[in-house]
Amino acid sequence: MPKPIGRRVLFSGYAKLPTGITATELYRVIGLVILVDMETETILEADCTLATQVARKHVAETLIGQSLKNGPEPLVRLIDQVYQGSAKKAIITALRICFDKYRSFKEGALPAMLD
């Protein structure tokens, strides 16, 4: 049976990419999107706008299944360990923005646009 859609929420974060890398020529900023199960506080899906499929897949696979219960730092440390590309700082910044949005939503600080 599929999970009820209401417990899954999508969060996005954006950060400026460094100059001199392909992703900057394509996008200027990195977009990172995570789909979170709000009951388990676990990342179900992740995607980002890096230039290569390998990098996008690696970042996604690294984040999927990770918990948000302990704040952003465990995820930041994980990315810092497993991603040694030039966009690391931008990925981490975008990840922290995603977490800030998640925390605000969880605390009820982000009202729906229809309210």
Segments the model singles out, each with a brief description of its role:
Residues 1-14:
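Short, compositionally biased leader-like segments
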Residues 16-33, 38-115:
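Active-site- and interface-proximal helix/loop "cap" or "latch" segments in soluble metabolic
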